[in-house]
């Protein structure tokens, strides 16, 4: 890697870190690491961004905005014992909510999310090329609906459409937990 490329990547990382802090309106710790995807730790307030070679600035902007959505809207509470829902189910519903809220807060972000998810879909980031999406479990289809549903057709039965709508209508974390419990219960039945 030449000096220009290394310097450009460093500046880009600094810019994305500053963007995260500005959007979150707090002095988050922003780390750039060799990880599979971005994440945000609500307890330590650490936002981790992956070092991807093939992703555009638009994808990084979306990753930053998504994780800032968690920083702004996902509370740091211990809900696992009380609700007894696997975190992966809550994350699917919470992702839909925080993306809706961050796009509502920053009017320029809907286009960023649209373009970034289009790019990720084009790169087969979700590894769907050899799969029939309709054969996937409901939680996976729900997740895909809210991420790349603009670019693929996903079939849902009547009850699943109700759960999709409930997910899209969540405004509070308490509502996320209620809907997540319904999604989890349905998925358990789906496996029987």
Question: What would you call each of these model-derived segments?
Answer:
Residues 1-192:
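Short, functionally important secondary-structure microenvironments
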């Amino acid at each position: 890697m030449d000096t220009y490329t290394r310097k450009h990547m460093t500046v880009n990382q600094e810019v994305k870190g500053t963007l995260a802090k500005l959007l979150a309106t707090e002095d988050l710790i922003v780390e750039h690491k060799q990880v599979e995807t971005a994440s945000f730790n609500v307890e330590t307030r650490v936002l981790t961004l992956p070092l991807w070679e093939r992703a555009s600035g638009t994808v990084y902007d979306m990753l930053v905005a998504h994780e800032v959505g968690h920083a702004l809207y996902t509370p740091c509470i211990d809900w696992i014992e009380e609700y007894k829902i696997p975190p992966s189910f809550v994350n699917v519903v919470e992702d839909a909510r925080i993306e809706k809220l961050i796009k509502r807060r920053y009017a320029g972000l809907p286009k960023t999310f649209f373009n970034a998810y289009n790019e990720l879909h084009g790169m087969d980031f979700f590894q769907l090329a050899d799969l029939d999406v309709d054969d996937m479990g409901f939680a996976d289809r729900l997740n895909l609906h809210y991420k790349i549903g603009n670019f693929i057709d996903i079939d849902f039965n009547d009850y699943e459409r109700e759960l999709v709508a409930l997910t899209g209508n969540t405004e509070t974390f308490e509502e996320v937990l209620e809907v997540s419990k319904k999604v989890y219960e349905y998925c358990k039945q789906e496996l029987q």
